[in-house]
From Swiss-Prot:
Glycosylation-annotated residues: S625, S628
Keyword Acetylation attached: yes
SUPFAM superfamilies the UniProt entry points to: Intermediate filament protein, coiled coil region, Lamin A/C globular tail domain
GO MF, any single term: structural constituent of cytoskeleton
Positions with biased composition (Low complexity): 403-414
Protein name as annotated: Prelamin-A/C
Species annotation: Sus scrofa (Pig)
Region (Interaction with MLIP): 1-130
PTM-bearing positions, type Cysteine methyl ester: C661
PTM sites of type N6-succinyllysine: K32, K171
Modified residue annotations for Phosphothreonine: T3, T10, T19, T416, T496, T505, T548
Lipidation (S-farnesyl cysteine): C661
Subunit structure: Homodimer of lamin A and lamin C. Lamin dimers then assemble into dimeric head-to-tail polymers. Ultimately, two head-to-tail polymers assemble laterally into a protofilament with a uniformly shaped rod of 3.5 nm in diameter. Interacts with lamin-associated polypeptides IA, IB and TMPO-alpha, RB1 and with emerin. Interacts with SREBF1, SREBF2, SUN2 and TMEM43. Interacts with TMEM201. Proteolytically processed isoform A interacts with NARF. Interacts with SUN1. Interacts with MLIP. Interacts with DMPK; may regulate nuclear envelope stability.
Length: 664
């Protein structure tokens, strides 16, 4: 369906296409079309305004009905507010009295704390003196043990030398016996040779006698034969016989002479050998006698030294036993004194901690009550302003007190606010991750970079020569510590590697000091790795710091609560039936048990609140729930529940065990 403007545009276009128009005609037609378009837009706007006026009339009727419903509920709500305001005034008076009592108790606790601190300082001085005396005695014991070990090593050395000398004496005695035996053998051989020489001489004489006898017998036979031979040949035979006898005699004499020379030569050689052997044996026997004499002299001197060392060792052992007994008595006395002082210090610390915890608990409760009263006052003032109620003289006086209290709280030099709250607070925590693949684990890493502690978790000793500990702190340079070459960590033992700036004493194998490094480093990401001699990572521990910033100002909390209250009014189109009620619940930060301090007296109002105290940053968390009444509801409260949390800081650390919990 075409609109009038579209039809007019169609007709004008047709006319323009049929007949040519002048510029003035064209201008008038355009103005006419503009006026027609504006008239159409005005008609549409008037229709829209009429429809909006109709809707506005319906809305005014609904608002009138809602105001009538709310006006019927104002009386009940006013009575509930007045009852709760009376309870708040009573609570404020009791809190003021409790505050005065707590201030008196705080002064007493401070005096007791000063006295206990002075006594603790004195006890710590006595403890330091006892520890210094114990260290001196331990140093004396170490020196005596070193002297004893030196004497024992010298004794073992002398015993070894004595054993060697005894072995040498035994060898020399054996050599002397062998030399004597050889001398006796040589003497026997000499006597045997002399006997043989005598025998040979006798045999030679006997042979000479035999030869002479044979010669005479031969002569006699020849003579007998010569007698028988005829006289013609006697001369020939005699000459031949003489020649033969001469030849035979010459041969016998040559043989005897040769045999005699050989016998004399053999005898002379054997006699020379026997004489040389006897001389050698006599020289060996003399040297053996001299060595034996020297060995006996040395053995006597070593025996005298050994007896003297044994006497010294016995005296040292007796003195060592006396020193050990005295050291044991000193240790027992020091242990008893140290145990007594530690028990007294523990009792004093327990009493101080208990008093501080009680004071901290009371201070937290008082702080929560002050916040609740301040929030009540802000809410009541807002409701009175919204409902245009005239405040009673009592409420004016309480408002005056509240304003004076807020001015005191807002003053920069207020001691109470400085004690209660800090402008901001940071809470840091460490998360650890450890990994172990060998016998030794990284048990503990100091957050301030003072030490690194390792533990041998196995049942066997672990040699850690040339092992390394590598420390990485974010993007900082890598720190590397190398163990001594002969270091060994016993089974189940712990070794602590201290930085030079920690002030620890170097006492291996339990405590080692890294003298070239003042600190292990501290930061937000600490990674400590244990590397063995082959370069393999056998253990690791990583610390990551997380920091939480807490903004906690009492006035800001009250203002936020008041702004939330007025914002609720604005969002509900100024509904006078909207209000906030709450109750309070105090929770113990350690054991988690609730302690009911107040309850809401309004029927149908269900409000939750909690106060918890953290153990690390000692921050108080106040959680409140608000139930708001809707504008279209009947005589009951609304169903919209709003929960808000407030963080209040306290710079004093607080640790409390469940046994000392004031709530339990």
């Amino acid at each position: 369906m075409e609109t009038p403007s579209q039809r007019r545009a169609t007709r004008s276009g047709a006319q323009a296409s049929s007949t040519p128009l002048s510029p003035t005609r064209i201008t008038r037609l355009q103005e006419k079309e503009d006026l027609q378009e504006l008239n159409d837009r005005l008609a549409v706007y008037i229709d829209r305004v009429r429809s909006l006026e109709t809707e506005n009339a319906g809305l005014r009727l609904r608002i009138t009905e809602s105001e009538e419903v709310v006006s019927r509920e104002v009386s009940g709500i006013k009575s509930a507010y007045e009852a709760e305001l009376g309870d708040a005034r009573k609570t404020l008076d009791s809190v003021a009295k409790e505050r005065a009592r707590l201030q008196l108790e705080l002064s007493k606790v401070r005096e007791e704390f000063k006295e206990l601190k002075a006594r603790n300082t004195k006890k710590e001085g006595d403890l330091m003196a006892a520890q210094a005396r114990l260290k001196d005695l331990e140093a004396l014991l170490n020196s005596k043990e070193a002297a004893l070990s030196t004497a024992l090593s010298e004794k073992r050395t002398l015993e070894g030398e004595l054993h060697d000398l005894r072995g040498q004496v035994a060898k020399l005695e054996a050599a002397l016996g062998e030399a004597k035996k050889q001398l006796q053998d040589e003497m026997l051989r000499r006597v045997d040779a002399e006997n043989r020489l005598q025998t040979l001489k006798e045999e030679l004489d006997f042979q000479k006698n035999i030869y002479s006898e044979e010669l005479r017998e031969t002569k006699r036979r020849h003579e007998t034969r010569l007698v028988e031979i005829d006289n013609g040949k006697q001369r020939e035979f005699e000459s031949r016989l003489a020649d033969a006898l001469q030849d035979l005699r010459a041969q016998h004499e040559d043989q005897v002479e040769q045999y005699k020379k050989e016998l004399e030569k053999t005898y002379s050689a054997k006699l020379d050998n026997a004489r040389q052997s006897a001389e050698r044996n006599s020289n060996l026997v003399g040297a053996a006698h001299e060595e034996l004499q020297q060995s006996r002299i040395r053995i006597d001197s070593l025996s005298a030294q050994l007896s003297q060392l044994q006497k010294q060792l016995a005296a040292k052992e007796a003195k060592l036993r006396d020193l050990e007994d005295s050291l044991a008595r000193e240790r027992d006395t020091s242990r008893r004194l140290l145990a007594d002082k530690e028990r007294e210090m523990a009792e004093m610390r327990a009493r101080m901690q208990q008093q501080l915890d009680e004071y901290q608990e009371l201070l937290d409760i008082k702080l929560a009550l002050d916040m609740e009263i301040h929030a009540y006052r802000k809410l009541l003032e807002g409701e009175e302003e919204r409902l245009r109620l005239s405040p009673s003289p009592t409420s004016q006086r309480s408002r005056g007190r509240a304003s004076s209290h807020s001015s005191q709280t807002q003053s920069g030099g207020s001691v109470t606010k400085k004690r209660k709250l800090e402008s901001s607070e940071s809470r840091s925590s460490f998360s650890q991750h450890a990994r172990t693949s060998g016998r030794v684990a990284v048990e503990e890493v100091d957050e301030e970079g003072k030490f690194v502690r390792l533990r041998n978790k196995s049942n066997e000793d672990q040699s850690m020569g040339n092992w390394q500990i590598k420390r990485q702190n974010g993007d900082d340079p890598l720190l590397t510590y190398r163990f001594p070459p002969k270091f060994t960590l016993k089974a189940g033992q712990v070794v602590t590697i201290w930085a030079a700036g920690a002030g620890a004493t170097h006492s291996p194998p339990a405590d080692l000091v890294w003298k070239s490094q003042n600190t292990w480093g501290c930061g937000n990401s600490l990674r400590t790795a244990l590397i063995n001699s082959t370069g393999e990572e056998v253990a690791m521990r990583k610390l990551v710091r997380s920091v939480t910033m807490i903004e906690d100002d009492e006035d800001e909390d009250g203002d936020d609560l008041l702004h939330h209250h007025h914002g609720s009014h604005g969002s509900s189109s100024g509904d006078p039936a909207e209000y906030n009620l709450r109750s309070r619940t105090v929770l113990c930060g350690t054991c988690g048990q609730p302690a009911d301090k107040a309850s809401a007296s309004s029927s149908g109002a269900q409000v939750g609140g909690s106060i918890s105290s953290g153990s690390s940053a000692s921050s108080v968390t106040v959680t409140r729930s608000y139930r708001s009444v809707g504008g279209s509801g009947g005589g009951s409260f609304g169903d919209n529940l709003v929960t808000r949390s407030y963080l209040l800081g306290n710079s004093r650390p607080r640790t409390q065990s469940p046994q000392n919990c004031s709530i339990m």
